[in-house]
Amino acid sequence: MRIEIPEQKKLVLEARLPIRWGDMDAMGHVNNASYFRYLETVRIDWLWSVGCKPAPDGEGPVIVNAFCNFYRQLEYPGDVLVRLYVSDVARTTFETWGTMARADQPDVVCAAGGATTIWVDFPRQKATDIPDWMRQLLQA
């Protein structure tokens, strides 16, 4: 099953990450788990940059699903250019999407993925409304 990245989305961060030798598998290309790590790294960098840091005694984002579509292989050496987008802001959830391309071929998407994020009140272990300050960042 392939999940398509929506046309309507907001670019929130573009980052260049090194493809490490250890990211590859026995077949000589980047292992599929590494693509999820690239998406996670950029998603966390963006959340930290907007002041959304872990608050175990408060509230914050939790990933409830994640996916990745693979189109072309990434290989060492090189850098991966990850573009992170947000969309579909609801009361307690929003979507993040990422495209991954070689930095030396930024218009050739090698993989694209996403994650559904739910805002959680951690002490209660229940979904709660996305706070206004975060909603403004997501929708601006």
Question: Model-derived features: where do they sit?
Answer:
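HotDog/MaoC-like acyl-thioester-processing domains
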Residues: 1-15, 70, 74-76, 86-140
